[in-house]
């Protein structure tokens, strides 16, 4: 191998002085033109996989293959046992289990996964993902490496598996109406040889199921050796989970003759595989969600008791019997990233199958990327967006390949990254949070050579120097995804995204409690915190009816149960209320707030009250400290303005709800809260004190300072009885263009300022007359078309209120009080219709809390009169 060394200093986005950087600036402009004119895989439609009418992001992560995975995924044995086919780097590979040597078998413009080897060893069927819109079926001839397209339409296809004699292919499709059904179709020499047979059909459960929808799913077919029956996973007649394992004949609508062989709550991970004698199935399970991690189990195919084969404190996914039944190949995330592993069926020996070398079928080179802080010269962690010459994304083998909430494909780097890439021009964008200019650049990859790039990210500003420290209020470490995440990795990603405080939340997924083992009593920062970055481990309490909430600073124990209102469980009742649980958390010293409260731009009162139905109750009772934005949107302003208009000082905060062990999820810190701690600096208590005091602004990218007579958000300006004038000042900076500044007084827009020149910065100064008590806040917005590289629909930031008190008059609004009363009336109507109450006493207790909140708002109405 040869090395070519290049040192590139990238321009700041929006930099005005190009006289000394003409060559580099020209390179960047060329890069932008190329990105604008070349189709790039991985930019899905506005909704990922639109032909799938249910399932959502959880299903996309737990069931759909990663597109791509930087490490092996979805093993399938060759019939002679000499090779294991896997998905890796967007292609199908065959791996020698003795040496770890991997040979690329399939390649085209799509991301390939879910391989299944034909019984004669000549063909591998697999899925082909176009980057988030459809998933199709293809088949490759192992000897000639010629690819045949099997499907090409708007639907989703998954789980291809050859029949024991190779004459048929079973698979899952969203045909005809967007719901997941199993089909079988004859196949011969890599081509269809007849019409498909629908083994299942669309079927309604009769009502919406929590996280799993109204319509049944039929997934993961596995052939019985006789070729006349299938096992599959279906949630037909199942209220919770992705379904049971059922056994059914391979005939049209065989689902009508199905028998259940495994009855347990599952989460898309089962992946049953039948032994060569047809007597047993091996599968991945959390034992009805009793375990935190997925382990391997065996059970009779006729039904019976499961037997646990592994006892890991990590996950074991996608098990597949070897042809002789002596080994099980599976995917292990013991060391973080998914890796190929083997388990001896009789004896229990375990082997991690390292990929010793990748033999690509096309010319490849290596990119070595080194990143540093442009101001200090020190190495720094970053986020990397990469599009290779073939329009696809590639990630280093030691990095987790991710798809952001907006559909960008990225990886995080600690400061050095090494990735194999196809020959040609690679386009990169290197990002470090909101306070550094992104660096855009291109490089040429040459076959057999190493291209070394050193990139500096230059600071836009330093908010900490002004007393502002940022952190998302909603981060999850592990949540049943493919990665076995760690606190260290969470801190690394937060470094790459440049957030100062990392607020990790322990949470339930159905009956499982993820990350409970990292809770440390005492209510303080976690011991791995550093002077540069604080880690706080809190809890997300997740009742689907009232709305999910955060609890940070619990001094003694986690709040249990972790949810209410789960159908068919012993916690189906809506008692206790969020009010009750807030009070219990506050008794432990916690700061609490509603999370991912409201999405979109419409008033939640016109719909089903959004994701924080209990907000207006707890705002009135003083039991919630905060309400969270989890994406760019305006819907939350309707209820929050109603609260602020009656002096209820609930703090608006930002937390994206990143689930960072999922491969497709919002990025850590993509929606965050900036808190002003002043001279106290970066310290946990100071940050949460500032949060509760409202010294905060929310941002998906723009940076804001806003004062009224020198008072910052959360503070009060006192004026005499006759009122007076106040001086408003605003300062805005942004790594992406901003379009407008919106000034709001008591919930009404009083001025909108368009930013027309240097759209990366704005300043505003106004002198305004005030005659009554109220509040000001500032909103900043950009255009959706200019959001990149932010992981948000558009650039948005807004401050909490600066309060104005005229004389001794409180802030009051009869209109907002009436709005709040209508909200609670609607909430109570929904609660009255809930079927899971256990007793009249429980209902009366909760409804009395609703009535106490009504009394508060009625009092505001009287006060405003």
Tell what function each PLM region has:
Residues 373-392, 398-401, 408-419, 425, ...:
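C-terminal functional module detector
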Residues 80-82, 120-122, 165-167, 226-228, ...:
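Short coil/turn segments that connect the beta-strands within blades of beta-propeller domains
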Residues 43-64, 82:
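Blade/loop signatures of beta-propeller domains
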Residues 59-93:
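Beta-strand-rich domains and repeat architectures in extracellular enzymes and scaffolds
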Residues 68-69, 87-93, 106-112, 125-157, ...:
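A flexible loop/linker signature enriched in serine peptidases of the S9 family
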Residues 349-366, 375:
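Beta-strand-rich domain onsets/edges
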Residues 468-652, 656, 661-663, 684-686:
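Catalytic cores of extracellular degradative/oxidative enzymes
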């Amino acid at each position: 191998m040869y090395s070519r060394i290049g040192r590139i200093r990238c321009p700041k986005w929006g930099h005005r002085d190009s006289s000394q950087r003409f060559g580099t600036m020209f390179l960047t402009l060329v890069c932008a033109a190329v990105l604008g004119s070349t189709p790039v895989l991985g930019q899905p439609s506005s909704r990922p996989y639109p032909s799938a009418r249910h399932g959502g992001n959880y299903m996309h992560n737990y069931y759909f293959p990663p597109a791509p995975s930087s490490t092996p995924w979805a093993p399938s044995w060759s019939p002679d046992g000499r090779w294991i086919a896997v998905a890796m780097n967007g292609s199908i590979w065959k791996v020698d289990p003795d040496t770890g040597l991997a040979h690329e078998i399939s390649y085209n413009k799509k991301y390939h996964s879910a391989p299944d080897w034909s019984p004669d060893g000549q063909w591998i069927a697999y899925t082909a993902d176009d980057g988030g819109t459809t998933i199709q079926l293809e088949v490759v001839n192992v000897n000639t490496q010629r690819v045949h397209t099997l499907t090409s339409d708007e639907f989703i296809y998954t789980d291809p598996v050859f029949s024991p004699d190779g004459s048929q292919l079973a698979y899952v499709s969203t045909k005809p109406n967007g719901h997941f059904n199993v089909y079988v179709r004859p196949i011969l020499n890599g081509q269809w040889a007849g019409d498909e047979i629908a083994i299942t059909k669309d079927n309604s459960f009769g009502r919406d199921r929590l996280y799993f929808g109204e319509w049944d799913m039929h997934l993961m077919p596995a052939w019985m050796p006789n070729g006349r029956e299938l096992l599959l996973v279906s949630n037909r007649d199942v209220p919770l989970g992705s379904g049971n394992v059922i056994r059914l004949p391979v005939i049209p609508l065989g689902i009508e003759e199905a028998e259940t062989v495994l009855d347990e709550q599952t989460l898309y991970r089962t992946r049953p595989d039948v032994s060569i004698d047809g007597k047993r199935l091996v599968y991945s399970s959390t034992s009805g969600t009793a375990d935190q991690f997925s382990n391997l189990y065996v059970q009779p195919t006729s039904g019976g008791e499961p037997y646990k084969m592994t006892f890991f404190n990590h996950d074991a996914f996608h098990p597949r019997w070897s042809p002789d039944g002596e080994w099980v190949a599976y995917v292990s995330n013991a060391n973080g990233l998914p890796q190929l592993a083997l388990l001896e069926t009789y004896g229990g020996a375990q082997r991690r199958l390292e990929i010793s070398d990748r033999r690509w079928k096309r010319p490849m080179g290596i990119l070595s990327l080194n990143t540093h802080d442009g101001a200090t010269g020190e190495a720094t962690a970053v986020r990397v967006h990469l599009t290779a010459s073939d329009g696809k994304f590639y990630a280093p083998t030691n990095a987790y390949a991710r798809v952001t909430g907006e559909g960008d494909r990225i990886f995080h780097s600690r400061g050095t990254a090494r990735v194999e890439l196809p020959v040609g021009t690679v386009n990169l964008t290197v990002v470090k949070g909101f306070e550094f200019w992104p660096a855009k650049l291109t490089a040429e990859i040459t076959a057999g050579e190493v291209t070394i790039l050193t990139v500096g990210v230059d600071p836009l500003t330093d908010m900490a120097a002004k007393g502002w420290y940022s952190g998302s209020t909603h981060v999850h470490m592990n949540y049943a995804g493919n990665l076995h995440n760690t606190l260290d990795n969470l801190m690394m990603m937060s470094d790459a995204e440049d957030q100062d405080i990392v607020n990790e939340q322990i949470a339930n997924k159905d009956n499982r409690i993820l990350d409970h083992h990292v809770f440390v009593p005492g209510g303080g920062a976690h011991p791995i915190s550093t002077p540069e970055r604080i880690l706080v481990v809190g809890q997300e309490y997740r009742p689907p009816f009232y709305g999910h909430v955060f609890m940070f600073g619990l001094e003694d124990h986690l709040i249990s149960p972790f949810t209410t209102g789960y159908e068919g469980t012993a916690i189906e009742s809506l008692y206790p209320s969020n009010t009750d649980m807030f009070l219990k958390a506050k008794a432990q010293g916690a700061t609490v707030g509603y999370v991912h409260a409201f999405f979109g731009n419409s008033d939640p009162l016109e719909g089903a009250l959004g994701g924080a139905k209990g907000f207006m109750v707890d705002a009135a009772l003083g039991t919630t400290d905060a309400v969270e934005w989890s994406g760019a949107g305006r819907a939350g302003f309707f209820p929050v303005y109603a609260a602020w208009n009656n002096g209820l000082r609930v703090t608006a905060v930002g937390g994206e709800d990143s689930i960072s062990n999922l491969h497709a999820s919002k990025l850590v810190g993509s929606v965050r809260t900036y808190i002003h701690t002043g001279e106290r600096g970066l310290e946990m208590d100071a940050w949460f004190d500032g949060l509760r005091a409202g010294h905060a602004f929310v941002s998906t990218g723009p940076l804001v300072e806003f004062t009224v007579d020198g008072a910052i958000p959360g503070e009060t300006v006192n004026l005499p009885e006759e009122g007076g004038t106040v001086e408003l000042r605003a300062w805005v900076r942004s790594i992406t263009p901003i379009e407008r500044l919106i000034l709001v007084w008591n919930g009404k827009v009083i001025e909108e300022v368009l930013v027309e020149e240097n759209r990366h910065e704005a300043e505003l100064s106004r002198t305004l007359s005030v005659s009554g008590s109220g509040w000001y806040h500032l909103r900043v917005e950009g255009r959706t078309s200019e959001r990149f590289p932010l992981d948000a629909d558009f650039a948005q930031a807004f401050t909490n209120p600066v309060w104005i008190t005229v004389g001794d008059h409180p802030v009051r609004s009869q209109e907002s009080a009436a709005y709040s009363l209508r909200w609670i009336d609607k909430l109570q109507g929904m609660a009255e219709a809930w079927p899971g109450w256990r007793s009249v006493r429980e209902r009366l207790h909760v409804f009395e809390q609703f009535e106490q909140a009504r009394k508060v708002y009625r009092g505001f109405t009287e006060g405003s009169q």
